[in-house]
Amino acid sequence: MRSLYFPAFALLGLLAGCDADKIKDVAANNACSLDGPVGGAQVHANVPFEPWGWAYNVAAGSVPKDVTLQIINAKNHVVLTAPATRVPRPDVAKAFEDSNLADSGFVAKLDISKLESGTYLIKVIQQEGNLRYNCASPNKFTIQSSKG
């Protein structure tokens, strides 16, 4: 009977390693800010839309290179996903007294011309290794579109 323990433990070890590369979602709502658009803003679908703010990884005190923004409609469906670009935010580094946050800013240029009129919010997603830090902004904004 003891001879079965080793193969069983070896198999469990292999199976546990299968999840090592899976992306893990982590809530990070205290480590970001969507500074624009401000809550209650009305934006027009035919005008360039450039949301901006800052975000970092609180646990590691780092600034993940990869940032993605998701536009989420009132039905909680993701209707647009686009990469954001990191930009300098010396004000954030100063506010947190941490020079590592000097490049914690982000900005994106999104084409929202195909979106319908309605209320939306933005989720900021940072990825570092197999961890994906999700930060949902409480700022809701309205898109005015000719599509209705």
Set out the residue ranges of the language-model regions:
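Extended low-complexity, serine/threonine- and proline-enriched intrinsically disordered segments
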Residues: 64-82
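Aromatic sugar-binding surface patches on proteins
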Residues: 89-109
